[in-house]
From Swiss-Prot:
Keywords annotated in UniProt: DNA-binding, Plasmid, Transcription, Transcription regulation
InterPro entries in alphabetical order: Cro/C1-type_HTH, Lambda_DNA-bd_dom_sf, Tscrpt_reg_HipB-like
Residues annotated as signal peptide: none
Stated name of the protein: Uncharacterized HTH-type transcriptional regulator y4mF
Tree of life domain: Bacteria
DNA-binding region, residue range(s): 26-45
GO MF terms held by the record: DNA binding
Domain HTH cro/C1-type: from-to ranges: 15-69
Lineage of source species: Bacteria, Pseudomonadati, Pseudomonadota, Alphaproteobacteria, Hyphomicrobiales
Amino acid sequence: MAKRIKTPADIGALVRIVRKEQNLRQDELAGVAGVGLRFIVDLEAGKPTAQIGKVLQVLQTLGCSIDILAPGERRK
């Protein structure tokens, strides 16, 4: 499922949806992703100052990937 992400809240919502689809609790995701429970709670709440490295770590753990398109590029 491709999602257009424009805000930290969009990332948080995506993380929550995918986590629930995988039947993971927040503490379980935190454990397998190697981050703290507070980080997952804040991430899902759309905290705008979440550390990008940890965000990428959580997304990778969930099996998500990020495609960044330069101006003028189109999704293939």
